[in-house]
Amino acid sequence: RIFWWGRVMRRLKIDELPQLINILNGTMSIVGPRPAAADQVEITRGGENAIAATVPCGLTSQSSLWDYIYGDQFPDEEEYNEKVLPIRLKLDVYYVKHASFFGDIKLIIWTVLAILYTACGKYPQWMHEKLVDYANENLDHNLNHNLN
């Protein structure tokens, strides 16, 4: 049986709030790449994505916002891996390369806004577009770096 607050937490997709305990005991950060699932470590933390493992895992980041607002549209794992995962991986790398105190504050605010948009049944198109821009900026940076 799920209590009413459990249904609300699931609807707003904030059912991971118990991870605040991990933040309080220092094993997680508020902002940082999401922890990698055991079956996805090779994909999410291998190759050029290995940089994501150099910072503490967090409750929110650009990639978790991308997954939050866009990822649930693809229940099929294959489609998710094709349309959502590549951007998520680029956003994790982007976060590590651009991490800052004020950037983390902005991500916390964006996370609250994403939850509010979801609660109101709205889609944060502006956030979607900005996250794609960040991922493309990281891709452009990598291409330019590899060409030099």
Region annotations inferred by a language model:
Residues 21-148:
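Hydrophobic structural segments characteristic of membrane proteins
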